[in-house]
């Protein structure tokens, strides 16, 4: 059973009045129940928190974790798309003239990290930091992960949707992001184990050359 939150506090008894009870703290089970109806608590797992990250969490804590989940899901979806694109096509030209390194010379997947010159890595991390600190700001009071980047060209289309449709699309994004996080992790593991990251190809017997 889920443990209850801290027991109610007591004020010490006075010579002039009895002990006064404070308002009972909200139990962990009540907290859990309050999150079971949130977007993302859906089939097939429903509300699933095996690590207890939401134990005794308030709404602010939940929204922080949801923000992180949405962001990581989006990054993982981009990583999957980039991995597949890099496997099939490369940009023309040079990645680094000083290192005499062309885009065509770059390996795919995790192996690419060891080939990027230090100056290139610095640019990548600097750009990510700039986006994180100055551009991708969550809209105050909105769903976690709602960014406004120079105005939203799709705002009118989104606003015209019913609340049910918006909730459905948010749930789809969460599910796709969760699948992508597991997918890119699986590809990275299989790349390191056998240099064959595309498990579906292996299962179907579709041959490919990786790096």
Curated annotation (Swiss-Prot):
What GO cellular-component annotations does this UniProt entry give?
chloroplast thylakoid membrane; light-harvesting complex; photosystem II
UniProt-listed GO biological process terms: photosynthesis, light harvesting
What up-regulates or down-regulates this gene? Levels are increased up to tenfold when transferred from high intensity to low intensity blue or white light.
Which InterPro entries does the record cross-reference, listed alphabetically? Chloro_AB-bd_pln, Chloroa_b-bind
Please give one Gene Ontology molecular function term for this protein.
chlorophyll binding
Regarding the membrane, this protein is recorded as:
Multi-pass membrane protein
List, alphabetically, the SUPFAM superfamilies matched: Chlorophyll a-b binding protein
The subcellular localization recorded is: Plastid, Chloroplast thylakoid membrane
Which UniProt key words apply to this protein? Answer: Chlorophyll, Chloroplast, Chromophore, Light-harvesting polypeptide, Membrane, Photosynthesis, Photosystem II, Plastid, Thylakoid, Transit peptide, Transmembrane, Transmembrane helix
Q: Where is the transit peptide?
A: 1-33
Q: Which residues cross the membrane?
A: 75-95, 116-136, 177-197
One Pfam family this sequence matches:
Chloroa_b-bind
Question: What job does this protein perform?
Answer: The light-harvesting complex (LHC) functions as a light receptor, it captures and delivers excitation energy to photosystems with which it is closely associated. Energy is transferred from the carotenoid and chlorophyll C (or B) to chlorophyll A and the photosynthetic reaction centers where it is used to synthesize ATP and reducing power.
Q: How does it assemble?
A: The LHC complex of chromophytic algae is composed of fucoxanthin, chlorophyll A and C bound non-covalently by fucoxanthin chlorophyll proteins (FCPs). The ratio of pigments in this LHC is; fucoxanthin: chlorophyll C: chlorophyll A; (0.6-1): (0.1-0.3): (1).
Which family does this protein fall into? Belongs to the fucoxanthin chlorophyll protein family.
Name of the molecule in the record: Fucoxanthin-chlorophyll a-c binding protein F, chloroplastic
């Amino acid at each position: 059973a889920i443990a209850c939150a801290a027991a109610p506090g007591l004020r010490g008894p006075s010579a002039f009045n009895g002990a006064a009870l404070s308002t009972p703290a909200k139990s962990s089970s009540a907290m859990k129940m309050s999150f079971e109806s949130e977007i993302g608590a859906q089939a097939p797992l429903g509300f699933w928190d095996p690590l207890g990250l939401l134990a005794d969490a308030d709404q602010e804590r939940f929204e922080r974790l949801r923000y992180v989940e949405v962001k990581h899901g989006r990054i993982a979806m981009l990583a999957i798309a980039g991995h597949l694109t890099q496997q099939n096509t490369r940009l023309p030209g040079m990645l680094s003239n000083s290192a005499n390194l062309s885009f065509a010379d770059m390996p795919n997947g995790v192996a690419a990290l060891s080939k990027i010159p230090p100056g290139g890595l610095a640019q990548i991390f600097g750009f990510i930091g700039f986006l994180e600190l100055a551009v991708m700001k969550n809209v105050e009071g909105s769903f976690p992960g709602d960014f406004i980047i120079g105005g939203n060209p799709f705002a009118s289309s989104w606003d015209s949707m019913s609340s049910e449709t918006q909730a459905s699309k948010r749930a789809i994004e969460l599910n796709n992001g969760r699948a992508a996080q597991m997918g890119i992790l699986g590809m990275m593991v299989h790349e390191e184990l056998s240099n064959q990251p595309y498990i579906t190809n292996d299962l179907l017997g579709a041959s490919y050359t990786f790096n």
